């Protein structure tokens, strides 16, 4: 299984909800076994860094993750989120 984790910070804190709504579009892509978007609780903040939202998804394999990223909804989401975000940090790792 591949675990996919992405951290987002909004360029303007007023846009966090707009970004969250756009990221929720990704839940309609059928290739993920599990998908969720959540607001960071900020309980372990790092000085100089801010994470507003977290995307967490699980995929059966690398092919499923690649299909997810190739889906038209993924491209649509990027077009909506990219102008509103400050940073995006992603990590994928094999589990199990």
Name every feature range the model reports, one short phrase each.
Residues 1-53, 60-70, 93-96:
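Short S/T/G/P-rich N-terminal loop/turn motif that feeds into the first structured element of a domain
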Residues 22, 80, 84:
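Residues that form generic nucleotide/phosphate-binding pockets
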Residues 28, 73-74, 83:
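Residue-level marker of structural boundaries
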Residues 17, 75-76:
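Long, contiguous binding/interaction regions
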Residues 87-91:
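Charged phosphate-binding loop/patch that engages nucleotide di/tri-phosphates or the phosphate backbone
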Residues 58-59, 84:
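Conserved catalytic core of Hanks-type protein kinase domains
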Residues 69, 78-81:
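Short, flexible helix/strand-to-coil boundary loops that buttress conserved ligand/catalytic motifs
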């Amino acid at each position: 299984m591949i675990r996919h984790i992405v951290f987002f910070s909004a360029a303007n804190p007023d846009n966090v909800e707009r970004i969250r709504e756009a990221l929720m579009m990704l839940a309609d892509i059928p290739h993920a076994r599990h998908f969720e978007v959540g607001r960071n609780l900020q309980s372990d903040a790092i000085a100089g860094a801010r994470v507003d939202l977290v995307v967490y998804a699980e995929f059966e394999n690398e092919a499923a993750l690649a299909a997810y990223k190739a889906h038209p909804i993924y491209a649509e989401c990027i077009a909506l989120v990219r102008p509103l975000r400050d940073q995006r940090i992603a990590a994928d790792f094999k589990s199990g």
